[in-house]
Each structure stands twice: as structure tokens, then as C-alpha cells.
Amino acid sequence: KTGYSVGIYGENSNVTNNASKIIQVGKDGIGVYIAGAGNVAENYGIINGVGDNAKGIFATDNSIVRNYGTINMTGDNVMGIAGQNGAQIYNDANGVINVTGNDVTGIYLSGDNTKLINNGVINISGTGMGISYTPTVELSNINDTTGTTIGSTSKQYQLPDMPTLVNRGEININVGGNFNYDGIRVI
């Protein structure tokens, strides 16, 4: 693995995928990447992704996403739209997000001031979440007006905080000579 591909990259600029246009993305790829305060990525067309870990649109650093088109993502751990660090995500009434596979996510949110307005449709085939968010996202910043997420699992799910373990002392383990070290990593 040498990296990932991006269909349209917009940092400190605006980008548009026009109607009748198609962006194809593969494994570990991103259809549209947008970053920078107030910069806008608009999708009126189609974004198709086939391959594990692919993302239709990735937004960060106070950028804005408006989806008026269709995002189709197929593979394990795929995401339709991912927003972080103050991104604003708008899935229009005409916006459709289809995610198929294991552990898929329609819209993923993380970071302070990240916001979502979902007026569109999120369809899930397989296992996953329509909308998932980390604890850093205020629930009041998530507005899902349609309630049309289709899938076998929850519509919204707050992902747990990752635990932090800090040892400021000593840890002594005496298990004799019958201890299996496989899979143990000490940092």
C-alpha cells in the first residue's frame, strides 16, 4: 500500500461535481476532499466507490459539504460522507447515500463544532450505522429531519471515547514460567 487516491481535491477552494458527472473511487480512496474554513464541496452528480475503507466525501477544518446527488459506496468500512473538525454537512432532500458492506457508515462526524443537517435518504445494506458520531460532537449539532435511514442497525450512534490508561507507578507481574506473551504489546 503506497497511499490513497482522491477524485477531486479542494483545499482553500470550492469544488463541484456537476449533475450527470460521475466520480469513481477505489479501495482506501476519497471521491471528494475539501478543507479550509468556508470552502464548499457540492455534489450534484454521482460518486461511486468500490473497495474497503473508501469515502465518498471527506470534509475537514470548517469546510462545507452539500450533497444534492447520489453517493454509492460498496465495501467494508466505507463511509458516504465523513466530516471532522468543524465541518458542516448538508444532505439535501434529493441527496441519497447508499452504503453496502460490513461496518459501513452513511455519515460520520467527529470533532468540535462539526454539524449535520440530513434532509435526504441514507440506505444501509449489510451492517453499520446511518449516522455515527464521536463524543466530541454535540448532539444538538445533528439535525436529522427525514428519519428515512434504512438499515438493520441504529440510525444514530455515539461512538465511545477511547480509554486512556496512565501508569505513574510500578506494575509487577509474577506468573511463573507459564505465561503466554502472544499478542501482548507494551509501550
Residues of each region from the PLM?
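General N-terminal targeting signals
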Residues: 133-135
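Beta-strand-rich solenoid/repeat architectures in extracellular/passenger domains
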Residues: 1-5, 14-28, 38-53, 64-77, ...
